[in-house]
Amino acid sequence: MKKYFFLFLGLSVLFMSCSDDDGIKNGPSPDPDPTADVAAQDFMWKAMNLWYFWQADVPDLADDRFSTNAEYTAFLENNSNPENFYYSICNRHEEIYGEETAIDRFSFANEDYTELVSSLSGISQSNGLEFGLGLIGDTDNVFGFVQYIWPDSDASTKDIQRGEFFTRVDGVQLTVNNYINLLFGDNSTYTLGMATVADNTISDSDKEVSLTKIENQIENPILVAKTLDVNGTKVAYLMYNRFLSSFNEDLNDAFAKFKADGATELVLDMRYNPGGSVNTSRLLASMIYGTNTSDVYIKQRWNAKIQAEFSDEFLTDYFANSTGASAINSLNLSRIFVIATGDSASASELVMNGLDPYINVIHIGETTRGKNEFSITLVDDSENNFIYNSDREGNINSQNSWGLQPLVGRNENADGFYDYTSGLSPEIELSEDLTNLGVLGDVNEPLLARALQEISGASAKIDFTVEMPAESFTSSRLHTPLKDNMFLDKPLPTNLELE
């Protein structure tokens, strides 16, 4: 059976079939007993069997795994929790195997696909406070430190700022066992118990700050965009916190301003950027390097059954000369200074790796997270091959609202390099200092100051000694539906044919 279709992956998906048969088949297609309560598990298995990057490496996802429908039904019923079932059919997922031995660290599921889809546009319930969480000494107690605050958010109206600390929520000490429920639970309002740091010791203070999460909040990922004069050199500085396609024009406008200011150097600050849109990463790279549409930005690799259907041309993404709405404003740089840390992942790393064959990428900060795979959004719409399409929400199984964001491929640069699962290492190593986080965009903020020192060639005037490294085990951004996802948002070819 053959299926010809056109679709968009990522947030907005358009699907058009040119045949009347009942879906792609890649081998025997098992069906569960209709009386079994396994709709979610059935959807998950079939979607992952088709699209999952490591499908061939997971025995339970093999096309010939089940010889009878009864065997398939029993397999699905064996795990009644859909989320646990999903992670069990991933390739050694971190949720089961832990960080040290996991292969798949990033695929995830959401029991409400509408929440997942909204997050891809940067829409979420938020109070606007972004923070890291660390451990207090050798205990299970947790402290938080404020990294930045969204403009025009609830937090922006409260007495709290970057560099402050907290240890309690609603009077309860944060621990590794309760922080998720206290900070990221269903409570829309909570009160932070603040703390101070002196001599590497965190002490509770009497200060309290109450914050309220607001529905449908949208973070503008461009936190700071300014041009600095460094000993006569015009240096553009961009603090960019997530790759969101809905802000592509704002990003292009920022580069237009950099050009108008005469910027000849760029410091791209992605220290807190967990990723996002692959296409937006391509546009940003073009704004930095150039708009030659014959230069390869990245190449994709899917699982074997999908890869075989794509042409080399489709699998290759080139630098762009347009955002789709306007001509790209490019600085045409021969080098770039990137501030990146362990909080920098996926599309952030993609920009660095994609630019590396063409210009000198000077990485200042820490080793990045190490995420080189991309994902797509899957829902229980079997007639659309499980791809989410905003125009087909009425066709999604009303009894199953689960949405999946599995890893379905990886990216490599023009030189073929892709192996950075351990992260990208900095040329200039420097951690944030909890005792001196500084003001983002200020020339004295330590990481920016180090980049400017490299640009100017001036001898050190700032002491870069780190007294208390900002070591976190998680951050607020990793507890949003989008997490550190890198999603593909490009159309597949109209002549795609799967057997």
What are these regions (language model features)?
Residues 246-253, 258-265, 274-499:
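C-terminal "post-core" interaction segments
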Residues 1-4:
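Positively charged n-region of N-terminal signal peptides that target proteins for export
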Residues 14-17:
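C-terminal motif of bacterial Sec signal peptides marking the signal peptidase cleavage site
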Residues 19-265, 280, 290, 470-499:
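Flexible, low-complexity junctional segments that flank or bridge functional domains
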Residues 215, 272-274:
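Active-site-proximal loop/turn and secondary-structure-junction residues that shape catalytic pockets
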